Amino acid sequence: MKKLLLGAAAAALLFATPARADITVCTWGTITGPDALVNGMTYGTADYLKYLNESKGGIAGEKIKVLMLDGRYKLDEELKIYRRCADQEQAVVINGWSTGASKALRDQIQQDGIPFISESFASEVLDPEKYPFTFIAGPTYEQQMIIALRDLAAKGGKNVVLMYSDNEYGRGPVNVVRDSGVIDKLGLKLVDLVEYRYDAQDVTAQMLRIKAKNPDLVYVQGSTPQLIVALRDAAKAGLPTKLFVGNMYNISPAIPEQLGAAAEGFRAIQTYSFFGDNIPAMKEIEEYAKKNEVEKKDIYFIKGWLKGKVIAAAIESAIKKAGGKVPADIKAFRKSVRDEMEALKDFDTGGITPPFTFKDHQGSVQARVAEIKDGKYAPVGTWINAR
């Protein structure tokens, strides 16, 4: 198992190469903490860049220095890590984590001029004109929610409950969808908004309240740990699992593993291929795994591998534009990487998503509904455009 080296900021440092740091990439996530069940995307990005170091000698003959850091899902820790990456480490690209940190940093990122890929799918950090250095890697939380609402409307359902955590990750997307009027436009009725503590270990009271509303759909804007609690207590309250739909961060093997039969029928929005699918990117992962341990074998690792591909492609293009050498001016290098990331067109993701163009800073917006059947997630619909 990879060893975590904890510094003064309680940050985990992995994969730092001894080579000169001409190309430094920082990626942070919840390596330890309440959201650790979905941290495969942090490992995936770091592992892809390590894969390039091992298989191709890095980028343009230069090894990539990769810092994988632990933000512990604490805003103050994430802000400290950002400053470390931007200033001391002179990172050319930063891959951040939470919605709260991404929103808190969104103006600073533009001032610093550092390409920043957020793990958050919040629409409030996605604006190529206002936030030209910020990117995400898939449909926004709001777009994912609307897919579930469209699916309900198409099936003749009516009553909707939106359940969400008491933080930026939970409230922000729910407020955007509620205020957009899309629920009414689809002929649906919002019968309740139910908030819960992000670290709650019991939501039975909320489930009894939801049961009294007799909904046709309960959309949960929460991460995997919260979904496990919600579905467990829904079963106690006599609410069918099939009523519940979650976002991309609810496609975790931990849900059926921990809940067993109580997870059957739960649905979530799928935005990437599954780990183990017969796609070219999986062949790369298998090659990497011959010499290295892959700790996170899930869809989040696949997302991370995709982000690694995007980061590497943008850096490689920037170096080519500079005559094949790493630019000495870090500000100019960062700006060029940002420009090349935005310029990615018909980008081949190795089957993780359809080829995409990154001009909108979002990449692929393809998504579909997946349902837990016999303990595993299985697609129950075709890929659709989330816009």
Regions found by a protein language model. Give the residues of each.
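Sec/Tat signal peptide C-region and signal peptidase I cleavage site
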Residues: 15-21
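Extracytosolic ligand-binding ectodomains
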Residues: 4-10, 21-387
